[in-house]
Amino acid sequence: MDAEYLERNAANVAWMRQSFDLATRSGSRAIMIVAQADPRFENTWPAYVQQRYMLEGLGLKSPETRRATGFDEFLAALERETVAFGKPVVYVHGDTHIFRVDKPLFGSTSRRIIENFTRVETIGYPDTHWVRAIVDPKEPNVFSFRLEIVEANRVKH
């Protein structure tokens, strides 16, 4: 990792921590982080999860050793902040643009999902539609999401 990356990554992690601190001090019911990057949560999954969800059907084995990525420090900080916050946390991103709403963040100690964390990956090119976020502070999860199809962009199959 070069100096530019290290500086940018430190700024990203500091910004995220400040955001969680502000949300905690202000009594926020939830927090939503919106970014372009897909931080590749799958790279941090326990081997049993990789086998079950990603590789088993292909007859492949998960890697014996995991390679470090540029997102490792960010994801570790995201885990710590999410657990400490204890309320709904949503990470919205594009990048790979495969529409999904899931629970991809696992505890590094428990190796189980962190229940108050949700990822929303927006749909994108060539399938140009959008995702509606519904915010209701009275609901326990605060956020819900719905894919909205743009009729003019619908494909004739």
Task: Identify the residue ranges that each predicted region occupies.
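His/acidic metal-ligating clusters that form di-metal
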Residues: 1-104
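Binuclear metal-dependent phosphoesterase catalytic core
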Residues: 97-157
